[in-house]
Amino acid sequence: MKKTLIIGVTGGSASGKTSVSHAILETFSNERIAMIEHDSYYKDQSHLTFEERTKTNYDHPLAFDTDYLIAQLKELQYGRAVDIPIYDYAKHTRSQETYRQEPVDVLIVEGILVLEDERLRDLMDIKIFVDTDDDVRIIRRIRRDIEERGRTLDSVITQYLDAVKPMYHQFIEPTKRYADVIIPEGVSNTVGVDIITTKIASILND
């Protein structure tokens, strides 16, 4: 059985990781390809009150159930389907619903800390860091969290200053050294994206 090609895509919050991932998905739309988000593996917090959940540092490695992600990636590599958890951003906890992911030839694993855990890195064939200016990222995050995740402006800014920014410099930015490719400015860097897709095509055609 052909080994699943696993691509890790990381970078700071609102850096353009998802856009880069979607560009790869679109390029190889004729292949068996899928994307899994690390955010889906935030730990279940249903045992906590809503107020307690809002105080969780979601940009810290301990907020994620990375063991679960690794286990499911290995299942997919062995050709077995898995049920991916769904995270409810409005309720700040894991939803009771899941979605079925069948084995694929190419799997993109996207998230702010996917290069932080060595065990996760070891599963990846290509590791990408999307490098975008802090000011651009905070503006994007404010728009996204208010429009798509039902957040207030004050809560977004408070979370950014208290957790997102310090965690980026402590945990996320240092993982840049593990990346095979660093893409400044995300999907607008068409040359960088083309280099990635060319490499993926080369591996698939071997």
Swiss-Prot record:
CDD domains: UMPK. Pathway: Pyrimidine metabolism; CTP biosynthesis via salvage pathway; CTP from cytidine: step 1/3; Pyrimidine metabolism; UMP biosynthesis via salvage pathway; UMP from uridine: step 1/1. It is an enzyme of class 2 (transferase). This is Uridine kinase. It is found in: Cytoplasm. GO terms for cellular component: cytoplasm. It catalyses: uridine + ATP = UMP + ADP + H(+); cytidine + ATP = CMP + ADP + H(+). ATP binds at G11, G12, S13, A14, S15, G16, K17, T18. NCBIfam families: PRK05480.1 (NF004018), udk (TIGR00235). It comes from Lactococcus lactis subsp. lactis (strain IL1403). GO terms for biological process: CTP salvage; UMP salvage. HAMAP family: Uridine_kinase. GO terms for molecular function: ATP binding; cytidine kinase activity; uridine kinase activity. Belongs to the uridine kinase family. Its EC number is 2.7.1.48. Keywords: ATP-binding, Cytoplasm, Kinase, Nucleotide-binding, Transferase. Gene3D superfamilies: P-loop containing nucleotide triphosphate hydrolases. Signal peptide: none annotated.
